[in-house]
């Protein structure tokens, strides 16, 4: 739980700006606002222009003061916001006066924590608030806005409702065997289990596909040494991030940079050239390259049109086949130079010249990124949420055999575990909810 006191913090980012907001939450919020403004006529949800004074009765600033009366506030408590002139000094001076009047500094995330304990938000909304502040792309903002609106909460509630249904009927079967139950109840339960499993599996698949929407999709550029990987990276970034040299093995480590493609943020990884290397440091770089490929959402495989397809190129082609689950864009570089490369070994490819722009590659990247981000599938935005869904699926899987064999106590145990797992996404599971369903659905003790 949290302390039942009054907290204060600056709600806007540090630095120079036109406006700063100081937020106060707790039972003494209105009292403190009255004290430091010498006004007592604040009305809920109305902005009042007020002069803010320090303890020596000297003017600090003129600010708009907005009072949110409990429970109609973000935290569910009395909240006062001081919208003062921007900059570091003024907002800190107001915070000092609020502290002198009886508040304490808020801990990181404490306003959201209070909102959670006062049932103003659930854990999914708390996570969305945290991540939307750090969002770097329009994709991320749109995805997190859906979670803020309650999309994931509604999804979890539907799963919980079905699991509570199963558990309620199972408990009745165990404790009140003489009760008349629907003849097809176990068939209903089995069907619900199948539907839940499919929903959760689809959600996990969509979430893995869209994982890069929040942090940025990882794009690995691979190819043998001196094929033009660093040059391509620099063209994508529009500045010289990687050293360009005719000497094979110049890039000995992975280089990672972020860039915007359309509405998407991608993290481009320029890998060390993949070949049989004798240099120890270069070998480490190649190992990191292979790791980068394994971790990438999209792979750009680069080949040199002006050189024959050799064993090193074939090694790259083998890597592509080994990573067939990934989106791979094959690029035949230096297409304006004399053709030496056997194009028949490539199923499909994009040609890039040394003189023209890379728009064909940009368009292909955008198509793949769009396909990963568009759609109405429920998406999990944190590892905590993913783990909760995985555990729910696992326990539903364990419950199947006891249901078939009639071992209802074991079945109830695994369904209870699944219920606790899925509930942890929004807020901890309360066993009283299951009892409410059980006693509400059946006439026990008639």
Swiss-Prot record:
Cofactor(s) the record lists: K(+)
UniProt-annotated binding residues for K(+): 226, 245, 247, 250
Compartments, record wording: Cytoplasm
Any one GO CC term of the record: cytosol
Keyword Transmembrane helix: no
Positions bound to (6S)-5-formyl-5,6,7,8-tetrahydrofolate: 23, 81, 120, 446
Keywords, ordered alphabetically: Cytoplasm, GTP-binding, Hydrolase, Magnesium, Metal-binding, Nucleotide-binding, Potassium, tRNA processing
Note on how the cofactor is bound: Binds 1 potassium ion per subunit.
Residues spanning the membrane: none
GO MF terms, alphabetically ordered: GTP binding; GTPase activity; metal ion binding
One GO process term, biological-process aspect: tRNA methylation
Binding site for GTP: 226-231, 245-251, 270-273
Residue ranges occupied by any TrmE-type G domain in the UniProt entry: 216-370
Major localization listed first in the record, in broad terms: cytoplasm
Residues reported in the UniProt entry to bind Mg(2+): 230, 251
UniProt EC number: 3.6.-.-
Presence of the UniProt keyword Cytoplasm in the record: yes
NCBIfam families for the chain: mnmE_trmE_thdF, PRK05291.1-3, small_GTP
Subunit structure: Homodimer. Heterotetramer of two MnmE and two MnmG subunits.
Function statement: Exhibits a very high intrinsic GTPase hydrolysis rate. Involved in the addition of a carboxymethylaminomethyl (cmnm) group at the wobble position (U34) of certain tRNAs, forming tRNA-cmnm(5)s(2)U34.
PANTHER family: TRNA MODIFICATION GTPASE GTPBP3, TRNA MODIFICATION GTPASE GTPBP3, MITOCHONDRIAL
Family: Belongs to the TRAFAC class TrmE-Era-EngA-EngB-Septin-like GTPase superfamily. TrmE GTPase family.
Name of the protein this chain belongs to: tRNA modification GTPase MnmE
């Amino acid at each position: 739980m949290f302390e039942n006191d009054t907290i204060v913090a600056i709600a806007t980012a540090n630095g120079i700006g036109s406006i700063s907001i100081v937020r106060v939450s707790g039972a003494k919020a209105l009292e403190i606002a009255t004290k430091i403004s010498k006004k007592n006529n604040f009305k809920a949800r109305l902005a009042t222009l007020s002069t803010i004074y320090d303890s020596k009765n000297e003017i600090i600033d003129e600010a708009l003061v907005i009072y949110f009366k409990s429970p109609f506030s973000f935290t569910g408590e009395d909240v006062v916001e001081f919208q003062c002139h921007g900059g570091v000094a003024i907002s800190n001076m107001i915070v000092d006066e609020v502290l002198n009047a009886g508040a304490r500094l808020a801990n990181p995330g404490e306003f959201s924590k209070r909102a959670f304990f006062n049932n103003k938000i659930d854990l999914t909304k708390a996570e969305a608030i945290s991540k939307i502040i750090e969002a770097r792309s329009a994709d991320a903002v749109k995805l997190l806005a859906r979670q803020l609106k309650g999309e994931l909460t509604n999804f979890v509630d539907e799963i919980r409702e079905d699991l509570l249904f199963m558990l309620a009927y199972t408990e009745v079967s165990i404790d009140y065997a003489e009760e008349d139950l629907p003849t097809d109840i176990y068939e209903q339960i089995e069907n619900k289990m199948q539907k839940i499993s499919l929903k959760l599996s689809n959600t996990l698949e969509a979430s893995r596909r869209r994982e890069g929407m929040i942090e940025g999709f990882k794009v690995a550029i691979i190819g043998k040494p001196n094929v033009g990987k660093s040059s391509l990276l620099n063209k994508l970034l529009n500045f010289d991030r990687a050293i360009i040299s005719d000497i094979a093995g110049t890039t000995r480590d992975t280089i990672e940079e972020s860039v915007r493609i359309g509405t998407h943020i991608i993290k481009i990884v320029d890998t060390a050239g993949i070949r049989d290397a004798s240099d120890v440091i270069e070998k480490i770089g190649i190992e990191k390259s292979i790791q980068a490929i394994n971790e990438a959402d999209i792979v750009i495989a680069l080949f040199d049109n002006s050189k024959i397809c050799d064993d090193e190129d074939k090694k790259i082609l083998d890597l592509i086949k080994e990573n067939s689950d990934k989106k791979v864009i094959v690029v035949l570089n230096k297409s304006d130079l004399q053709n030496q490369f056997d194009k028949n070994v490539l199923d499909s490819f994009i040609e890039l010249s040394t003189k023209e722009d890379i728009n064909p590659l940009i368009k292909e990247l955008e198509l793949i990124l769009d396909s990963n981000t568009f759609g109405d599938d429920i998406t999990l935005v944190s590892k905590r949420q993913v783990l909760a869904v995985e555990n729910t699926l696992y326990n539903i899987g364990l419950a199947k055999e006891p249901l078939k064999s009639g071992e209802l106590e074991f079945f109830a145990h695994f369904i209870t575990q699944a219920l606790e797992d899925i509930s942890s996404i929004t807020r901890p599971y309360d066993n009283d909810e299951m009892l409410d369903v059980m006693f509400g659905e059946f006439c026990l003790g008639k």
